[in-house]
Amino acid sequence: MSFENFAIITLKENVFALLPEAYAPFDPIVDDLPIIPVLFLLLAFVWQSAVKFR
């Protein structure tokens, strides 16, 4: 299987990963959304250090 065939199959299988055309401008933002839970975890440490880990 060549790389081109693999890429085509992968795109067809990931059709649900594509945003509808109306939401296309938000595509770069959607790519970064999975980092939000990590930011909340870091915020918890910043908060606890601010209150001296009570």
From Swiss-Prot:
Subunit structure, interactors included: PSII is composed of 1 copy each of membrane proteins PsbA, PsbB, PsbC, PsbD, PsbE, PsbF, PsbH, PsbI, PsbJ, PsbK, PsbL, PsbM, PsbT, PsbY, PsbZ, Psb30/Ycf12, at least 3 peripheral proteins of the oxygen-evolving complex and a large number of cofactors. It forms dimeric complexes.
Protein name as it appears in the record: Photosystem II reaction center protein K
Keyword terms: Chloroplast, Membrane, Photosynthesis, Photosystem II, Plastid, Reaction center, Thylakoid, Transmembrane, Transmembrane helix
Superkingdom field: Eukaryota
Transmembrane stretches, start-end: 33-53
GO annotation, cellular component aspect: chloroplast thylakoid membrane; photosystem II reaction center
InterPro entries named in the record: PSII_PsbK, PSII_PsbK_sf
HAMAP family listed in its UniProt record: PSII_PsbK
Organism classification: Eukaryota, Discoba, Euglenozoa, Euglenida, Spirocuta
Pfam families xrefs: PsbK (PF02533)
Subcellular location(s) per record: Plastid, Chloroplast thylakoid membrane
Membrane topology: Single-pass membrane protein
Function: One of the components of the core complex of photosystem II (PSII). PSII is a light-driven water:plastoquinone oxidoreductase that uses light energy to abstract electrons from H(2)O, generating O(2) and a proton gradient subsequently used for ATP formation. It consists of a core antenna complex that captures photons, and an electron transfer chain that converts photonic excitation into a charge separation.
Family from the record: Belongs to the PsbK family.
A Gene Ontology BP annotation from the UniProt entry: photosynthesis
Propiece span(s): 1-17
